[in-house]
Amino acid sequence: MKLIIQAGIVILMIASLNNAAKCALEASGEKAPIARGENLIAGAAVNDSAGSSDLTLIIQLKIDGKIVVDEGHKCTAIQPEENIPSDKDPTGWTQPKFDDKDWEKGEYGVGYGDNDDNLVIGKGDLAMVYSRAVFEVKSIRSNSKVELGADFDDGCVIWINGVEVAREANTDIPDEPEWDSWTDKGSGHSHEASKTDPPTYEFVELDVKVIGNPFAVEPADKLATSWGEIKAGY
């Protein structure tokens, strides 16, 4: 009897490890575009299926060992009921210049139902909660060490300055997530947040692409418009 119980425990441990390997944060392979100064990180917390009892996303971002985003970082959030800003551009909300002034304001984490959310938002009959946060970088190099961590339930997708850099692996979330994308449309995917204090993050390392100010108005656009107006006057 003792041997049978021990064998059962081993099987459960192996199954748990296999599930952890299947359900983990995974880097997209795209370089994270990061500027010196202000940057934008955006995250979608994704439910597994309709009627989910809880949803969570907490993000941590470290650059060369310095934490620039963490639990308690100021953010905005919304639970979408349509693609934002449009069906033609369902991830346009991840861009730095997107106007989120009408979104709810609070601090990471975001979600509902499990007492680990600073900004409580959402309900189980909708698939996602979107969040955005501005963070400051004083120094960045192409060889900077960038570590992205997330504590989440059930899935997540994360963008930096409009570029997807990581997501939960082995879900049914499409390549370009829409407002009604669930993690489980037959895959059986499920993932629980740590519910620890402080959060227990899953980490990935990101390569870096150093960029200019992502919030800046493009001078070239201004010039083209002005020149077009000048020509139109003749």
Q: For the regions a protein language model found, what residue spans apply to each?
A:
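C-terminal segment of classical bacterial N-terminal signal peptides
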Residues: 14-21
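Accessory carbohydrate-binding/adhesion or oligomerization-edge regions at the termini
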Residues: 23-114, 136, 145-153, 160-179, ...
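Short acidic, low-complexity intrinsically disordered linear motifs used
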Residues: 217-234
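Extended extracellular/luminal ectodomain segments enriched in beta-structured repeat modules
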Residues: 126-129, 137-147
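Extracellular beta-rich ligand/substrate-recognition surface
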Residues: 113-130, 190-201
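Beta-strand-rich, non-transmembrane domain signature
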Residues: 174-196
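Sec-dependent signal peptide recognition
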Residues: 2-10
